[in-house]
């Protein structure tokens, strides 16, 4: 199963309502075959612009990241379910970037300045 990341914006609510909405979201992921690795809260803050969702205008929201594994066939179903949730302002699922081996930098390659600064053509005398 591929690894995904759910970027989730919930409408501004008090802590118990936010916890209930997150619990409902995580349970819906697991009901659709996902394995949740991590849930990270990025805090509540002002949205960059007013977002209209479920006939309401939102200017503040809670930002959350959910790291999970899921079958590729379930991702579209998960997004459809989250779009119908009245507490979710904006759901977005992206494929988690694969961890790649980091290559060490070779450093700065010296450039011969004489070739760059001086013309190789001969001057007329």
Swiss-Prot record:
GO terms for molecular function: rRNA binding; structural constituent of ribosome. Gene3D superfamilies: 3.30.70.60. One of its GO terms (cellular component) is mitochondrion. It holds the Pfam family Ribosomal_S6. Keywords: Mitochondrion, Ribonucleoprotein, Ribosomal protein. The keyword Lipid metabolism does not apply. The keyword Ribosomal protein applies. InterPro entries: Ribosomal_bS6, Ribosomal_bS6_sf, Transl_elong_EF1B/ribsomal_bS6. It is found in: Mitochondrion. GO terms for biological process: mitochondrial translation. PANTHER family: MITOCHONDRIAL 28S RIBOSOMAL PROTEIN S6 (PTHR21011), SMALL RIBOSOMAL SUBUNIT PROTEIN BS6M (PTHR21011:SF1). Belongs to the bacterial ribosomal protein bS6 family. Component of the mitochondrial ribosome small subunit (28S) which comprises a 12S rRNA and about 30 distinct proteins. This is Small ribosomal subunit protein bS6m. It comes from Mus musculus. The lineage of its organism: Eukaryota, Metazoa, Chordata, Craniata, Vertebrata. The gene is Mrps6.
